[in-house]
């Protein structure tokens, strides 16, 4: 059996005296894996802990068999994890092309270059001279993903990539995730929208109150209203074609 690309063992973390993550364990290879859960269940804290932005209080994180918990965010990124956080975090005055060229140094001969990003997202190529503030929400998210790809990491971590986006733009991101995996890049997707999460990844880890409560498949999750209600606080809106979103929980961290 081959070694997992990412392995998380008994990971806990929090803020001050408040524990948010509680004994998280999972592993993944070169695949797309979804972390789905209601708002406030600790999903963003998991992302930030994996990236070294929040200190782990216990447990281990291994990437390619090497422990990376305790490293700075810069060292985690150099180890091979690329992060697309919530909020997109673009520069309003820089053009699309300037955003990409800023990170293009050293990409010659690697899989992801600015031209490869434009090929993945043709809409960005059409808007390459537009400033970050002039882009639509969907275009900003494409740019945020494309900019991250230029780091040429072995694992891309996406936090709520479908947030605020029209279904047609979500479809573009779904296609991008599938292509990344097909070309050898692992993707860990954190989502609370059921349809987006299950379209991006067949394997789903359900997060409740800072713990991985269940592992299931996208197929099973879409087809099981009881599972949706129990873990996500939603009904069977998926049957009507609506975009079910996990109900928020009070007093918890995202």
Across the structure, where does each feature detected by a protein language model lie?
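Helix-to-loop junction immediately C-terminal to a conserved catalytic motif
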Residues: 51
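ABC ATPase C-loop
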Residues: 148-149
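Catalytic Walker B motif of ABC-type/P-loop ATPase nucleotide-binding domains
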Residues: 156-160
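Conserved structural motif at the start of ABC-family nucleotide-binding domains
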Residues: 6, 20-21
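ABC ATPase NBD coupling module
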Residues: 55, 67-88, 114, 126-130, ...
């Amino acid at each position: 059996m081959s070694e997992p690309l990412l392995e998380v063992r008994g990971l806990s973390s929090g803020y001050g005296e408040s524990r948010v993550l509680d004994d998280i364990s999972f592993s993944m290879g070169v695949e797309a894996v979804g972390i789905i859960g209601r708002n406030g269940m600790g999903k963003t804290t998991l992302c930030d802990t994996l990236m070294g932005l929040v200190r782990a209080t216990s447990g281990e994180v291994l990437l390619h068999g090497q422990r990376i918990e305790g490293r700075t965010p810069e060292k985690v990124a150099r180890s091979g994890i690329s992060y697309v956080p919530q909020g997109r975090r673009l520069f309003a005055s820089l053009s699309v092309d300037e955003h990409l060229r800023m990170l293009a140094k050293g990409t010659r001969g690697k899989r992801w270059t600015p031209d490869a990003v434009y090929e993945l997202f043709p809409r960005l190529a059409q808007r390459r001279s537009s400033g970050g503030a002039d882009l639509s929400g969907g275009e900003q998210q494409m740019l945020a993903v494309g900019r991250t790809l230029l780091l040429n990491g072995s694992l891309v971590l996406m936090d709520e990539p479908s947030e605020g986006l029209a279904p047609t733009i979500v479809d573009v991101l779904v296609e991008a995730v599938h292509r990344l995996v097909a070309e050898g890049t692992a993707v860990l997707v954190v989502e609370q929208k059921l349809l987006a999460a299950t379209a991006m990844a067949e394997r789903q880890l359900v997060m409740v109150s800072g713990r991985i409560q269940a592992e299931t498949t996208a197929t099973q999750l879409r087809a099981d209203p009881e599972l949706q209600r129990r873990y996500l606080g939603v009904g069977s809106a998926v049957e009507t074609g609506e975009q079910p979103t996990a109900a928020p929980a009070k007093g918890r961290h995202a």
